[in-house]
Amino acid sequence: MTKIPDNIRQDAFKYVMENKPNELFELIAMNPGLINERSQGNQDTLFMRACRYLHKDIIEILLNEQANPTDINNHGNNAIMCLFYREDQHKKPKDINEHDEKAVAILKLFEEKNIPINCFTGQDADKDTPLIEAARAALPQSISFMLDYLEKKSLLRRSIITYK
């Protein structure tokens, strides 16, 4: 596998952050190995970063290019966990609601593409789960979606029975 030059990797992460799907797509087309590149800091993938920034268009591009939605970073966080991180914990209710709506839209995309939504099995280094992160971020629609998803998959009932 060819090593991706640092400047190209950095451009890719910049395009994800700035929500520039066309530029990212072109860069990936010229550098297919870029899809698996990780950030130098915490080893996030482009897919994780797209989830963190709630950039659904970029998430779709990355999935179409075979990004691995189950990768984890150095902290044990997966892409679903990244959906619920809010950079600014002092957001106004309107901003929180917008964050919640975008996160749910991405969760629905995952469900449509049969990407497992591991709400309380995917734990990070602190033993937090996506469901805990969504609650911590005060994202009620995301919590409701995940609980409904678990119920649909009969995972909630099995988990509760197993826990007893």
Swiss-Prot record:
The keyword Repeat applies. It comes from the Bacteria. Coiled coil: none annotated. ANK repeats lie at residues 42-107, 126-149. InterPro entries: Ankyrin_rpt, Ankyrin_rpt-contain_sf. Keywords: ANK repeat, Repeat. The keyword Heme does not apply. SMART domains: ANK (SM00248). This is Putative ankyrin repeat protein RBE_0585. It comes from Rickettsia bellii (strain RML369-C).
